[in-house]
Amino acid sequence: MRIVFMGTSHFAIPSLKALIASEHEIAGVVSQPDKQRGRGRKVTPTPVKEIAEQYKLELLQTANIKTPESIKRIKQWKPELIIVVSYGQIIPLSILEYPRHGCINVHASLLPRYRGAAPVQRALMDGIKSSGITIMFMDEGLDTGDIIMQEAIAVDDNINHGELEKILADMGADLLLQVVDRLVQGEKLPRVVQDDSQASYAARISKEDEIINWSEPAYAIHNRIRALNPQPGAYSYINGTKVKIFASKVRSEAGSGVIAEVIEVDKNTFQVQTGEGILEVLEIQKAGKKRMPTSEFLKGFTLHPGVLLGSKEG
């Protein structure tokens, strides 16, 4: 099978590597342009570009896949199938309809739930108990195409975004190869129309999403923290110092302190009163410093019960 692969983020890497290791031919790879990242604003290639260059695959990077030049380049590769995994742009109909087997997509949710750019993070914020992978035919909509195959997994209450995304990325690669192999064998793939009445949208994570609101229930804050671990991190302020919290634990007791108040501190951790219940902070990062267990943080940061979190002024 002659394939063009379109992807950008780390989530796409297992699928691309699985195709490289298979007997299928990768005619070309399409990815987003390099971007400035990190505190030093260093120009960094996309993860998919790095793999494409490592295996000496033909590569197209474009900020706009809809330009005549981009479309022409893809058609010159003469793909029989286009595979899209975490690419990041809406693909025009002129590309979607070009390959004789169409375009298929690996999506990190059980569609039609969590259509959009941040399905894993939004699902974790919602405290979902199960998630999964959908392989689908692509159309012009946002994750609205017919479903070929789905597989679900249980989601632990403490798993974070990075951990769950890796599991789903590996699962997606396995399911993708199954689908491509079925195509090669001449099998007609199923097409299950999505029920739009059951759809939900997973919008990109915003700056506002990163802010911890201590008036929320402890479980909701815990879900936000794990949804934003490892990036970008959920944050608050302690005595005017910005801190990101990467791991937490919901305590069983309700608590009777003031919302956002530190109600207990020991050498290993500290506990905060929320709008409903108590949250224990397990891993934290002071601005400009490395992530560390709360026990290490408290060795160099004085914190007493009664301090209120959330104020920039301290």
UniProtKB/Swiss-Prot annotation:
Key words of the record: Protein biosynthesis, Transferase
Catalytically driven reaction(s): L-methionyl-tRNA(fMet) + (6R)-10-formyltetrahydrofolate = N-formyl-L-methionyl-tRNA(fMet) + (6S)-5,6,7,8-tetrahydrofolate + H(+)
SUPFAM superfamilies reported for this sequence: FMT C-terminal domain-like, Formyltransferase
Domain of life: Bacteria
Matching CDD domains: FMT_core_Met-tRNA-FMT_N, Met_tRNA_FMT_C
Enzyme category, top tier: transferase
GO cellular component terms given for this protein: cytosol
Positions bound to (6S)-5,6,7,8-tetrahydrofolate: 109-112
UniProt-listed Enzyme Commission number(s): 2.1.2.9
Molecular functions (GO terms): methionyl-tRNA formyltransferase activity
Coiled-coil blocks: none
Protein family: Belongs to the Fmt family.
NCBIfam families assigned: fmt (TIGR00460)
Database matches in HAMAP family: Formyl_trans
Its job: Attaches a formyl group to the free amino group of methionyl-tRNA(fMet). The formyl group appears to play a dual role in the initiator identity of N-formylmethionyl-tRNA by promoting its recognition by IF2 and preventing the misappropriation of this tRNA by the elongation apparatus.
Record-given protein name: Methionyl-tRNA formyltransferase
Lineage: Bacteria, Bacillati, Bacillota, Clostridia, Eubacteriales
Gene name of this polypeptide: fmt
